[in-house]
Structure formats: C-alpha cells, structure tokens
C-alpha cells in the first residue's frame, strides 16, 4: 500500500469520513554536495519514490487534530493559541513548527483541520523523512487556507521550522528538493540564489540507496557543531559563507588557518572542495561521463571521512563494497548528514545485481547489521493528489 492509500484509508478509519485534501511530498537522496547547503553552496540531489502523504479536511474551529499513522500517535494543538513544542513526541515538532511559521508568513491562516500522516521514508537514514513531512504539512496548509505560498516558500518555511522549532541547524537542500524535484532528473541547486539546473539521469543509469541501519540523530549536536565550525572558517576568510572562498584562496591561507585551528581548517577544506565537485559533477552527467562522476563521488566520500569526519566504519565498508562491484562505471559515497544512515551508488542498470549481491554476501557478516537495498526513481516534488 502506498503512503497516499494508507493515509486516505486511515483517515476514513480514524475520523469516520472521507478526506477532502490529499498531498504528498517525496524524500530525497543527495548524489553529491554534502554539508554545503548551509554554507550557501551547491548540491545535486533528486527527489525519490519514497515520501510522506497527508490526508485531511477542514474543521469548523481553529484546532489541528493530527494522527501519525506509522507511529500510531495523536497530537492536538490550537491555531488560536501560541504553538509550542511537545518534547514527549519528537515528530510533532515538524508539524507544529511548520504550521506556526505558515501562520507567521500568513497571519490570517486560522482554519483548523483533521489530518492523518503516513510515510515510507526510512527514519533516521539520511533520506530526509523530516523534510518530506515538513513540505507535506506546508503544502497541506497552503491548500487548506488557499494561501499565496510558492513551493519554494513552503520549502523555506520547512527549513525555518527545523532550525528554530526543532533545533537542528540544517540547510535548505532537503526541503527544496522535496518541493521542487523533477521526475527523471537530478537538480543542481544553488543554495544562495535558489537557482536550479535540472540534469537528466541517463535512461540506462540506476540510483541505488543502501541503508546501513546505523541510526543517526542530527539534533544531538554533531551536525550543529559542524555548522559552527564552518561559520568560524568563513569569519577567518572574511566572507559571508564558505561558498565565497575559492580553492585558490583556501590554499593560499590553509597553513595559517591550520595553525590556528586544524579542525576548522579540515572542515573548510571539505566545503570548498565539495562545492567544486558539485559543479564538476553537473558537467560529468551532462556529458554522460559516469567514470568521472564516480571519481568525484569517491573524492567526496574521502573528504567526508577524513576532513569533515562524519562517516562511520559501517558506512565506509558499504562504500568500499559497492565500489568493488561498480568499478570505473560509476560511484558510491555516503549521503545525508552523516554518523550512519545511507550510501548512494550511481551505476549502469546492469550493475545493480552485482552491487546488491556483494553487499548481501559481506555486510551483515562483517558488521552484524542487515542492510536495506533500494533502487530509486527520481521523482516529482510535492503535489496535491
């Protein structure tokens, strides 16, 4: 059963009536460009065929009554009163936060709703289950109140909710790709100007995701620490964000920054080189050069492992296994915020079984964890269904 079918069925079951509004927002996988979004840099994700559906209908009052189908939990809050976090149920922060900032953006939005949420994005896997939920809630509110919000604005409201209400200082990539994704395309996003360049995925190329089942929780601190270190580096270079530092400028002052703070220097090196890799990856894809894309993905993973220090041994092992099977016909790297989660692999379709097999034969035996393997389709962004 799809999330859309599940949400509609559950709504009928919980509220004894038919939903009048159904929305769906996808999760995402990032092919290259990690921890660059909050540095005003470049990223290249695609929306995937896993996401979050919301079914609901307008109420006569200002209350929101929400049922999370996958967690079998309820939440209730009132738009006529101040919306505050409920620390006992983490998921409610994403819903309440978005509704709160929709209200900030559109003060006349006061209509309540009954709604059911259902999703199939693996949780804490680095595939943006939270952004998918935020964008779905934003789109639901926009449709419910007939609000003058673009999909880009909905994405930025989702980011604001995660930053200021949930407490994770994420960038804007996850919400933007969930809102703006294009079927069969990767989307290069300039996270400062919000300009996007759609790049078609060649028909014979597969995007694979492997979930390590090492759980990460970005609110726990490491993510926010990395962001602070990047801000320190930007200040050192006298710029607004590390996006404004070229590779040549970085190399010119690298020794000086390393002497001051070797850890901050490593973080900056990752961001500066990763931005360039994204730009190079767009050209590689446009020319169908999968070997070059694979090299760039390998460099990205090494940089995340050695300079940004956000990988874990299980993730490094998955990347190593996938790369053995893929050879020079594509690439693999960790994807997402880090400290667990998933790897992404891009390779010709005929390599999929070899990648699946080498991981099935070795990963659990070596780590004691069982992976999940997905072949993904690049999908359309948020929609009313």
Curated annotation (Swiss-Prot):
It is found in: Cytoplasm. Its EC number is 2.7.1.6. One of its GO terms (cellular component) is cytosol. Keywords: ATP-binding, Carbohydrate metabolism, Cytoplasm, Galactose metabolism, Kinase, Magnesium, Metal-binding, Nucleotide-binding, Transferase. It is an enzyme of class 2 (transferase). Pfam families: GalKase_gal_bdg, GHMP_kinases_C, GHMP_kinases_N. ATP binds at residues 124-130. The record marks 28 as: Transition state stabilizer. Mg(2+) binds at residues 130, 162. The active site is at residue 174. GO terms for biological process: galactose metabolic process. It catalyses: alpha-D-galactose + ATP = alpha-D-galactose 1-phosphate + ADP + H(+). Substrate binds at residues 34-37, 223. Disulfide bonds: none annotated. Pathway: Carbohydrate metabolism; galactose metabolism. GO terms for molecular function: ATP binding; galactokinase activity; magnesium ion binding. Its main location: cytoplasm. It comes from the Bacteria. Catalyzes the transfer of the gamma-phosphate of ATP to D-galactose to form alpha-D-galactose-1-phosphate (Gal-1-P). HAMAP family: Galactokinase. Belongs to the GHMP kinase family. GalK subfamily. NCBIfam families: gal_kin, PRK05101.1. PANTHER family: GALACTOKINASE-RELATED (PTHR10457:SF7), MEVALONATE KINASE/GALACTOKINASE (PTHR10457). This is Galactokinase. It comes from Pasteurella multocida (strain Pm70). The gene is galK.
């Amino acid at each position: 059963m799809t999330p859309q079918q599940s949400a509609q069925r559950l709504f009928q079951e919980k509220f004894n009536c038919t939903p009048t509004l159904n929305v769906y927002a996808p999760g995402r996988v990032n092919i290259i460009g990690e921890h660059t979004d909050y540095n005003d840099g470049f990223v290249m994700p695609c929306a995937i065929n896993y996401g979050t559906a919301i079914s609901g209908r307008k109420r006569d009052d200002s209350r929101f009554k929400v049922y999370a189908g996958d967690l079998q939990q309820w939440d209730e809050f009132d738009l006529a009163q101040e919306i505050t976090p409920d620390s006992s149920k983490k998921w409610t922060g994403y819903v309440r936060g978005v509704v709160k900032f929709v209200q900030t953006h559109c003060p006349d939005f006061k209509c309540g709703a009954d709604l059911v949420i259902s999703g199939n994005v693996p949780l804490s896997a680095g595939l943006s289950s939270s952004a998918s939920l935020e964008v779905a809630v934003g789109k639901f509110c926009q449709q419910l109140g007939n609000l003058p919000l673009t999909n880009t604005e909905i994405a930025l409201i989702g980011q604001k909710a995660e930053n200021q209400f949930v407490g994770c200082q994420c960038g804007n990539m996850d919400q933007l790709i969930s809102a703006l994704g294009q079927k069969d395309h990767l989307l290069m996003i300039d996270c400062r100007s919000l300009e996007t360049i759609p790049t078609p995925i060649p028909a014979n190329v597969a995007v694979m995701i492997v979930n390590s089942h090492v759980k990460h929780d970005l609110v726990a601190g490491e993510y926010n620490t990395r962001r602070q270190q990047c801000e320190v580096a930007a200040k050192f270079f006298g710029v607004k964000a590390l996006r404004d530092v070229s590779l040549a400028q970085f190399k010119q002052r690298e020794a000086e920054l390393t002497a001051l703070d070797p850890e901050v220097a490593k973080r900056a090196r990752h961001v500066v080189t990763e931005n360039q890799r994204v730009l190079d990856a767009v050209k590689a894809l446009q020319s169908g050069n999968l070997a070059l894309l694979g090299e760039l993905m390998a460099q990205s993973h090494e940089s995340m492992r050695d300079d940004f220090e956000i990988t874990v041994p299980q993730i490094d092992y998955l990347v190593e296994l996938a790369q053995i099977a893929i050879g020079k016909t594509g690439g693999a790297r960790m994807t997402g915020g880090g400290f667990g989660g998933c790897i992404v692999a891009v390779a010709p379709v005929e390599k999929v079984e070899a990648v699946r097999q080498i991981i099935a034969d070795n990963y659990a035996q070596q780590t004691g964890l069982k992976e999940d393997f997905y072949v993904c389709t690049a999908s359309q962004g948020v929609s009313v269904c």
